[in-house]
Regions:
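Transmembrane beta-barrel strand/turn architecture of Gram-negative outer membrane proteins
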Residues: 79-89, 139-148
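Short glycine/proline- and aromatic-enriched beta-strand/turn motifs that initiate or cap beta-hairpins
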Residues: 19-71, 211-215
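Bacterial Sec-dependent N-terminal signal peptides
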Residues: 1-24, 212-216
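Membrane-embedded beta-strand positions of outer-membrane beta-barrel proteins
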Residues: 28-32, 57-59, 85-87, 99-105, ...
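Transmembrane beta-strands of outer-membrane beta-barrel pores
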Residues: 32-36, 59-65, 89, 105-111, ...
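Repeated loop/turn-to-beta-strand initiation elements of outer-membrane beta-barrel proteins
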Residues: 52-55, 95-96, 151-156
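Extracellular/periplasm-exposed beta-strand and loop segments of Gram-negative cell-envelope proteins
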Residues: 31, 59-82, 110-138, 168-182, ...
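Outer-membrane beta-barrel "beta-signal"
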Residues: 88, 202-216
């Protein structure tokens, strides 16, 4: 009996979503890239204020136990939390393909305990280490462009997003053991070499993502 009741609730929920899809005011987003590229799961919510304006926010979380790849190329206990409030402006509110320009603030906090790996110090010397505690703080502002790709009668769709902005990043290592100078990497992506660089820096920030969307 409980099984049939759960099935009834499940189908009633999606029937309601389908019925409201033509007059949706809310969108739930799930990032397709974040678990594999950013080592965290990202879920967002958008709310329609009027024909032109939407507001929303994204929350992201990851640990070494739940993400499919190692966080920050380190082995050990890792945790990432990120929040990104955002304001959207619809460029073509009457179009089936919704075009948005948005301003997004973001804050990221990453903590690593008893991790092992490799990194650049502030003098561009490359080291390996057997154990350390790690902290990364990143915050900044992006300007984004995104497109809502969907059918008006459907509750599901896609939203590619691209943007750029500025960010401040602070990385520190403490309680380090087994530190040794190592050979700098010569293969892989160039920006990946310096992703764990110790110290603080202010640089451009780029944002590329693909969202699965659920309208209701």
């Amino acid at each position: 009996m409980k099984k049939y009741l759960l099935l009834f609730v499940f189908f009633s929920f999606f029937k309601t979503i389908y019925a409201q899809s033509n007059d949706y005011k809310s969108i739930l987003t799930v990032s397709a890239f974040a678990p594999f590229r950013d080592q965290r799961y990202n879920i967002g919510y958008m709310r329609k204020i009027n024909e032109r304006w939407w507001v929303g926010s994204e929350l992201a979380y990851g640990t070494d136990k739940i993400t499919p790849v190692n966080i920050a190329n380190f082995e050990g206990e890792n945790r990432i939390f990120e929040i990104k409030p955002e304001v959207f402006y619809s460029l073509a509110p009457q179009s089936r393909l919704k075009h948005f320009v948005s301003v997004e603030a973001f804050y990221l906090n990453q903590i690593g305990k008893n991790i092992s790996g490799k990194y650049y110090d502030e003098n561009d010397v490359y080291y390996s280490f057997s154990s350390a505690d790690y902290k990364r703080i990143k915050y900044g502002l992006n300007i984004n462009y995104s497109i809502l790709i969907h059918k008006e009668s459907s509750w599901f769709g896609f939203m590619p997003k691209i943007g750029f902005g500025i960010r401040q990043k602070n990385i520190s290592y403490t309680n380090m053991a087994g530190k040794e100078e190592d050979y700098a990497p010569v293969d892989g992506l160039p920006f990946d070499y310096h992703s764990n660089r110790q110290g603080s820096n202010l640089r451009l920030n780029f944002n590329v993502d693909m969202k699965f969307i659920f309208k209701f």
